[in-house]
From Swiss-Prot:
It comes from Deinococcus radiodurans (strain ATCC 13939 / DSM 20539 / JCM 16871 / CCUG 27074 / LMG 4051 / NBRC 15346 / NCIMB 9279 / VKM B-1422 / R1). One of its GO terms (molecular function) is metal ion binding. Binds 1 Mn(2+) ion per subunit. InterPro entries: Indigdn_synthA-like, PsuG. PANTHER family: CARBOHYDRATE KINASE PFKB DOMAIN-CONTAINING PROTEIN (PTHR42909:SF1), ZGC:136858 (PTHR42909). Catalyzes the reversible cleavage of pseudouridine 5'-phosphate (PsiMP) to ribose 5-phosphate and uracil. Functions biologically in the cleavage direction, as part of a pseudouridine degradation pathway. Belongs to the pseudouridine-5'-phosphate glycosidase family. Substrate binds at residues 95, 115, 149-151. Mn(2+) binds at residue 147. The gene is psuG. This is Pseudouridine-5'-phosphate glycosidase.
Length: 313
């Protein structure tokens, strides 16, 4: 069996922002935040405004924010204002998942982290709760393409709770839930019996598991990891009613975007950015507004879960 890297070896790659390092050493709640949504999910300056706003929401709900990225080959856990600006404006920043981490770090590159790579870096830093917009999953047509997000594998092996608005609605939600079940990953919806579909509160799929409060979610995390059950938890937090786009309307836009993508012959990691961008066009910008609203909503929930988890000791 391969031995785990020592703390000294990990420290040689990690840069913890002082506020984050202090919070972790004192057992205070910290919430990890991803960076792909900043560099590849929204235009400038909306991306910077959103990122700063989300960090403030985490603070307002009792936790310390730790936006994660790779800059100059360093695993950054918490970003300065200048680093956030670089991430939001530098076109050389690549979207990186776990497979890309060793190359980006070894070659001193810049990378915006996906859900999977953010989870991995958060775990290395000792952060247990992570807020994002939507989680990746099984793509539609995966029976032909085998396009399945690394997010699902990371959820199966990394001890981090991911708070999201469910899996992205451009994906095959039913098959994604099946894969999570096979991998032993609890897919839990906060305060609802139906699993959400990112832009929409309803997906048509019953939630495998449900909790009613952040405190209940925190207790689930503690028990899971106390029992030695390796792997993460997907905590689905439905988008606020005031910001949602009904599932029926979204399905029309998604079908059109998928057809346009097929005509262009896009595949691999180009698919999700294209589809999300095309849906922004098809919805006249409404989907971007919904995306921002759900990210903010998830940040608040994640901070509350992290605060409750820290109280459990």
């Amino acid at each position: 069996m391969t031995s785990k890297p020592s703390n000294d070896r990990l420290h040689s790659y990690l840069d913890l922002q002082p506020e984050v390092a202090a919070a972790l050493s004192q057992g205070r709640p910290v919430v990890a935040l991803e960076s792909t949504i900043i560099s590849h999910g929204m235009p400038y300056p909306q991306n910077v405004e959103m990122a700063r706003g989300v960090e403030q929401i985490v603070r307002d709900n009792g936790a310390v924010p730790a936006t994660i990225a790779v800059l100059g080959g360093r695993l950054k856990v918490g970003l300065s204002a200048d680093e956030l600006e670089l991430l939001a404006t530098d076109k050389a920043v690549q979207k990186i998942s776990t497979r890309d981490l060793p190359v980006t770090v070894a070659l001193g590159g810049h990378g915006a982290t996906t859900v999977a790579s953010t989870m991995r870096i958060a775990a290395l830093a000792g952060i247990r709760v992570f807020a994002t917009g939507g989680t990746g999953g099984v793509h539609r047509g995966a029976g032909e393409t085998m396009d399945i997000s690394a997010d699902l594998l990371e959820l199966a092996r990394t001890d981090v709770c991911v708070v999201s608005a469910g899996v992205k609605s451009i994906l095959d939600i039913g098959l994604t839930l099946e894969v999570l079940e096979t991998q032993g990953v609890p897919a839990i919806t906060l305060g609802a019996d139906e699993f959400p579909a990112f832009y929409s509160r309803r997906s048509g799929f019953s939630s495998p598991l449900t909790v009613q409060t952040p405190a209940e979610a925190a207790r689930v995390l503690k028990v899971k990891w106390d029992l030695g059950l390796t792997g993460g938890v997907l905590l689905a937090n439905p988008v606020p009613e005031t910001a949602e786009i009904p599932a029926e309307e979204m399905e029309t836009h998604i079908t059109r975007a998928l057809a346009d993508m097929a005509a262009l012959g896009l595949s691999g990691k180009d698919t999700t950015p294209y589809l999300l961008g095309r849906i922004v066009e098809l919805t006249g910008g409404r989907s971007l507004e919904t995306n921002i609203a759900l990210v903010r909503h998830n940040a608040a929930a994640a901070a509350q879960v992290a605060a409750e988890y820290a109280r459990l000791g």
